């Protein structure tokens, strides 16, 4: 069965695993999910990620494994994740009108012609694009 919105599926898996205090979350692999995981690691929301071959476990293809990050008293590093641009309603932002998440405390992931960037990186490069998600 095909998945309508794989990015929303990824964000939901990470949100649910974080709320349940799981140490890692496994999901089907794609290039855009890998780029989102890179951004989450650069911004300090996850401790790491890697791609595993699913054929050894009896599956097909590759899986993306994300290692979640918690504070010293098991406080979550991800307070919330929200999908913004959806297949039924795309949301775009110009370089001059990039969104700020929680007044700059959170991160917006934006798909630009230069690849996936955070709102701060897109602002420095002067590019706009599709607003994929907010993380705070």
Swiss-Prot record:
Gene3D superfamilies per record: 3.30.1370.30, 3.30.1490.10
InterPro entries xrefs: Ribosomal_uS8, Ribosomal_uS8_sf
Keywords attached to this entry: Ribonucleoprotein, Ribosomal protein, RNA-binding, rRNA-binding
Species classification: Bacteria, Bacillati, Actinomycetota, Actinomycetes, Frankiales
One MF annotation (Gene Ontology) recorded for this entry: rRNA binding
Gene designation per UniProt: rpsH
Matching Pfam families: Ribosomal_S8
Family, per entry: Belongs to the universal ribosomal protein uS8 family.
Subunit structure of this chain's protein: Part of the 30S ribosomal subunit. Contacts proteins S5 and S12.
Protein known as: Small ribosomal subunit protein uS8
PANTHER family in the cross-refs: 40S RIBOSOMAL PROTEIN S15A
């Amino acid at each position: 069965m095909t998945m309508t919105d794989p990015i929303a599926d990824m964000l939901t898996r990470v949100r649910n695993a974080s709320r349940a205090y799981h140490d890692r979350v496994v999901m089907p692999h794609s290039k855009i999910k890998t780029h989102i995981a890179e951004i989450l690691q650069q911004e300090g929301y996850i401790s790491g990620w890697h791609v595993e071959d699913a054929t050894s476990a009896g599956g097909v293809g590759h899986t993306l494994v994300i290692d979640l990050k918690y504070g010293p008293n098991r406080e979550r590093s991800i307070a919330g994740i929200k999908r913004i641009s959806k297949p039924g309603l795309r949301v775009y932002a110009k370089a001059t009108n990039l969104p700020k998440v929680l007044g700059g405390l959170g991160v917006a992931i934006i798909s630009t012609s230069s690849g996936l960037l955070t709102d701060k990186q897109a602002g420095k490069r002067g590019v706009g694009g599709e607003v994929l998600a907010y993380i705070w």
